[in-house]
């Protein structure tokens, strides 16, 4: 892949910088020497986002007693007043993806009409498969289906005219089959079409404006059709600052979940005290390991760790399918998809919801969290998807990871529900969220081994997320440079750990959720505007002929 004199990526069809701009990648950067280390940073984006995060960490650690109720109140206010906005936005992203699939815009090719894929179809699909795995699946694979199942089983509860239960929709009082179907549908809703539509749109925007338009691989580039040269000024600075801050807090939320589950697993297996100190030590140790991975580089560090973790995750998944209720899992996979499709209209309704605890406590938080993660996942997907048509890109980016998520939730959540319903195993029903995975594995063969594998999965996902996340953040904070000095990634990796510690000490997972929602709110607006700009940009792109599209297939 070559570049032009502006630093833009040269299109294979000979056209360079489809957008005519004098901007050069890194032209606003400042080169600094800090001791033996050299830095190459976008002055305003790096400085403002870095200072904002430093102030947050210092304030949170200084006023621990005060910030805990503040975070709880902030989260409650945001999700209770703006849940409709998050849900409606999620629906918009899904609809736009469907429109791009069925309209002629789907024939636009990422990289230009003559572009060829950088990776084989199998290799590309494998990377999309990997994108669907992470700390979230390990943490929520058992806990979320069981939570929605138990809430649905309890049915609707109203006190003083206010619904106080957490059941999705109307629940299913005493009917375990109906409660299971509803619980799985409510879970899959959070892990399938909607989140992956968010990732697909942002990834597509980054890919089109980098590979097709020759602009830097940063968030601001997507907005060029709407704001023109102003994206290189404060309009763009604000967009990139929001992207950096949202990504840091989105990652910190995931790291908080990972630390909580790893500490719970160590307590369950080895009696390690479940304290703030334990979780802080875990975050420090795992962040240190992530730093080693950062220094080792992509090929020696995160790539190998990702391969190891994918193998471990696949082994644990197949173990649960084979040792668990195999036929129930295999048939449940299709039944759960059917239940999900049936319940999508009700689950995605943004207004006049009666199940407000579910829609506000789960869905609004999830959408904000996914949106804050979108620069991280989106940039990874964009960088590996050159040469694919828009239609092919969206279908695969949504369907492949969604299928992985549905299979994982069906295997782990379905096994746990079966243990309770068919075997009377109440520990998995009553356990706290971080403990449910280990409670499920505890009554299966080789429990100690699989539980240790579960902890290793969380730890390595923690490391790879932190490493990859620091790369994405650094690319944005370095003005789109993908080869910025390693010390900058070390800086951001360290900051992610510090933010996770601050959130853990300032209110635990509730604080992490509050900040994910808070930073996700402005970035939702950014992503909605980016969607409009993306469509405008796609309309200017040459499209493959119908014959060429059929030939590719």
Curated annotation (Swiss-Prot):
Give the UniProt subcellular location, in the record's own words: Cell inner membrane
Chief localization class? membrane
- Asked whether the keyword DNA-binding is assigned, the reply is no
Keywords attached to this Swiss-Prot or TrEMBL record, sorted alphabetically, are: Amino-acid transport, Cell inner membrane, Cell membrane, Membrane, Transmembrane, Transmembrane helix, Transport
> How does the protein's chain sit in the membrane according to the entry?
Multi-pass membrane protein
Keyword Transmembrane belongs to the record: yes
Tell me, which GO biological process terms does this entry list?
amino acid transport
Give Gene Ontology CC terms: plasma membrane
Q: Which GO terms describe its molecular function?
A: transmembrane transporter activity
One Pfam family it belongs to: BCCT
Membrane-spanning ranges: 43-63, 85-105, 122-142, 191-211, 231-251, 278-298, 310-330, 362-382, 393-413, 443-463, 490-510, 515-535
| Function, as annotated | Involved in the uptake of osmoprotectants. Can transport glycine betaine, proline and choline.
Family from the record:
Belongs to the BCCT transporter (TC 2.A.15) family.
Q: What protein am I looking at? A: Glycine betaine/proline/choline transporter VP1723
């Amino acid at each position: 892949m070559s570049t032009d004199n502006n630093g833009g990526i040269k299109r294979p069809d000979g056209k360079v910088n489809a957008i005519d701009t004098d901007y050069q990648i890194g032209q606003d950067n400042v080169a600094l020497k800090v001791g033996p280390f050299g830095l190459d940073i976008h002055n305003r984006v790096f400085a403002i986002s870095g200072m904002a995060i430093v102030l947050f960490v210092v304030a949170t650690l200084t006023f621990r007693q005060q910030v805990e109720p503040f975070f709880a109140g902030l989260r409650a206010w945001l999700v209770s007043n703006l849940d409709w906005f998050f849900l409606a936005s999620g629906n918009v992203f899904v609809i736009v993806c469907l429109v791009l699939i069925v309209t002629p815009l789907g024939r636009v090719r990422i990289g230009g009409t003559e572009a060829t894929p950088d990776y084989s179809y199998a290799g590309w699909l494998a990377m999309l498969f990997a994108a669907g795995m992470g700390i979230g699946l390990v943490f929520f694979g058992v806990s979320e289906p069981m939570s929605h199942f138990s809430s649905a089983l309890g049915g609707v509860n109203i006190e003083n005219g206010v619904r106080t239960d957490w059941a999705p929709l109307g629940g299913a009082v005493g009917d375990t089959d109906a409660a299971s179907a509803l619980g799985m549908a409510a879970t899959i809703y959070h892990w399938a079409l909607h989140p992956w539509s968010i990732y697909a749109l942002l990834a597509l925007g980054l890919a089109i404006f980098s590979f097709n338009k020759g602009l830097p691989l940063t968030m601001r580039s997507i907005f060029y059709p709407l704001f023109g040269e102003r994206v290189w000024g404060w309009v763009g600075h604000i967009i990139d600052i929001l992207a950096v801050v949202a990504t840091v807090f989105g990652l910190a939320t995931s790291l908080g979940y990972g630390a909580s589950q790893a500490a719970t697993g160590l307590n369950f297996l080895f009696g390690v005290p479940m304290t703030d100190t334990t979780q802080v030590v875990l975050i420090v140790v795992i962040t240190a390991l992530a730093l080693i991975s950062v220094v080792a580089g992509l090929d020696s560090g995160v790539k190998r760790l990702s391969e190891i973790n994918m193998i471990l995750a696949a082994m644990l998944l197949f173990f649960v399918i084979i040792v668990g209720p195999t036929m129930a899992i295999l048939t449940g996979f299709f039944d759960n998809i059917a239940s999900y499709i049936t319940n999508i209209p009700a689950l995605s309704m943004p207004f006049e919801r009666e199940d407000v605890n579910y829609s506000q406590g789960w869905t609004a938080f999830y959408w904000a969290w996914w949106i804050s993660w979108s620069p991280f996942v989106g940039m990874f997907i964009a960088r590996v998807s050159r040469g694919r048509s828009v239609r092919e890109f969206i279908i695969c980016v949504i369907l492949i990871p969604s299928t992985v998520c549905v299979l994982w939730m069906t295997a782990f959540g379905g096994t746990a529900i079966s243990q309770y319903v068919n075997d009377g195993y109440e520990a998995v029903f009553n356990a706290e969220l971080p403990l449910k995975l280990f409670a499920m594995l505890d009554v299966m063969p080789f429990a100690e081994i699989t539980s240790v594998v579960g902890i290793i999965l969380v730890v390595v996902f923690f490391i790879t997320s932190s490493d990859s996340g620091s790369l994405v953040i650094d690319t944005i904070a370095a003005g789109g440079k993908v080869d910025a000095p390693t010390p900058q990634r070390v800086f951001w990796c360290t900051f992610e750990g510090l933010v996770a510690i601050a959130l853990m000490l300032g209110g635990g997972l509730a604080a992490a959720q509050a900040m994910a929602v808070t930073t996700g709110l402005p970035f939702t607006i950014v992503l909605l505007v980016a969607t409009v700009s993306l469509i405008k940009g796609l309309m200017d792109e040459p499209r493959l002929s119908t014959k060429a599209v059929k030939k590719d297939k």
